[in-house]
Design a protein with these regions (language model features):
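OB-fold nucleic-acid-binding modules
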Residues: 1-13
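Glutamate identity and glutamate-enriched acidic tracts
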Residues: 6-9, 34, 67
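Non-catalytic, usually N-terminal nucleic-acid engagement modules in DNA/RNA processing proteins
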Residues: 17
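Short, acidic/hydrophobic/Gly-rich beta-strand patch recurrent on exposed beta strands
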Residues: 35-40
Length: 90
């Protein structure tokens, strides 16, 4: 697992992180997505689940540890993670 402060745009990651916050949202086109904040001991990073109903996205809540796979991108000058798989980690 890589720490959040080590990530750079273009990185592909796989690891277990704390879901600090989870909030449903809607794009300008009316498509639902999940806006989450991931945290580890080095800091926090914004994350997006653009297709929350896709295979591999399990139901999880804020303050759950989740297994995450995705790509690091930059939007409006800030790093964010586009999450492809998010599974609750027990």
């Amino acid at each position: 697992m890589r720490f959040l402060n080590e990530l750079h745009e273009g990185d592909r990651i796989s690891g277990i992180y704390l879901c600090k916050q989870k909030q449903p949202a809607v794009t300008k086109n009316g498509k639902p997505y999940e806006n989450i904040i991931l945290q580890d001991k080095t800091g926090m990073m914004d994350g997006k689940i653009w297709d929350p109903n896709s295979l591999g996205i399990d139901d999880f809540d804020a303050l759950d540890y989740i297994e995450v796979m995705g790509d690091v991108t930059s939007f409006a000058g800030a790093m964010q993670l586009n999450i492809k798989i998010g599974r609750a980690h027990v």
